[in-house]
């Protein structure tokens, strides 16, 4: 049984850092484990221009504690009005590494998102020419579609036609949650990748309802059946370079999670690599963790691998039940419970 594992320092290819006091509270957790992260643009107001991305990047770097090295990889928020000129400026900036597609209303702060993908074709064609990846929240928002089916329907209604029209557009299918998505990415032609969260590798939808409503397991896309979780694990440990680490760590104040209409999102930045190690260990595939966490993402994005290392040791420790979050607190996923791995 492996007791200690040292890997190339990993990256997080899907992260929510928020802004202001919340940013200052959560950024150190990510920077202690990850060298780089793709930063989601769904602030209020959203990050829709290169100038806004540059300003947000400066705020992130200003909040980084002394002694920690971390590079934020910025993204733009795609809207119906995003121009080809803004895409060209994003590519030329050197610090914008993708453009995020949120179907309007699909998740937290997505109200300004895309209402019809066809309205974005001029911008998407510019992205295809520039080699700038499209990062996709892959769920339809049609209220007639069951929430557990929205990812699979998105593949048929949006992803397949989009990739038929733009076969060379680099696409990341973010935080995939279904067997359908895993098989789509595995079998697709052209430049397609996918991020997978730790919580979707570890849990199925029963976790939300064990002994009552468990709001800290509620995220979007929502956890799915066990057959889907098993398919995600199989994809993550397969060795395919198309699958890579993206925590989708999404901090919310405790009172906004434990609420009559609670926010979606799991906070995992503090203990992300410990959770991934647990998932890969359970699958008997610790030897596949480094490629998933440290190699596949940089290869897809055309970036060099990191030069530092991170060590994981088999060691029991208790995760704090709650963490400071501005003038309030947040509850990490599995808060107050014992974890079996420790990152150093």
Swiss-Prot record:
Question: Some GO term, biological process aspect, for this entry: which one?
Answer: 'de novo' pyrimidine nucleobase biosynthetic process
Instruction: Note one Pfam family from the annotation.
Output: Amidohydro_1
Which residues hold substrate?
Answer: 16-18, 42, 137, 220, 252, 264
What SUPFAM superfamilies does the record point to?
Metallo-dependent hydrolases (SSF51556)
The keyword Coiled coil appears for this protein? no
Q: Which UniProt keywords apply?
A: Hydrolase, Metal-binding, Pyrimidine biosynthesis, Zinc
Q: Which residues bind Zn(2+) 1?
A: 14, 16, 100, 248
Stated EC number for the protein is 3.5.2.3
* Catalytic reaction equation(s): (S)-dihydroorotate + H2O = N-carbamoyl-L-aspartate + H(+)
What does the record give as cofactor? Zn(2+)
Q: In which pathway does it act?
A: Pyrimidine metabolism; UMP biosynthesis via de novo pathway; (S)-dihydroorotate from bicarbonate: step 3/3
NCBIfam families the UniProt entry points to: pyrC_dimer
What name is this protein filed under? Dihydroorotase
Q: Which organism is it from?
A: Cupriavidus necator (strain ATCC 17699 / DSM 428 / KCTC 22496 / NCIMB 10442 / H16 / Stanier 337) (Ralstonia eutropha)
High-level lineage: Bacteria, Pseudomonadati, Pseudomonadota, Betaproteobacteria, Burkholderiales
Q: Which gene encodes it?
A: pyrC
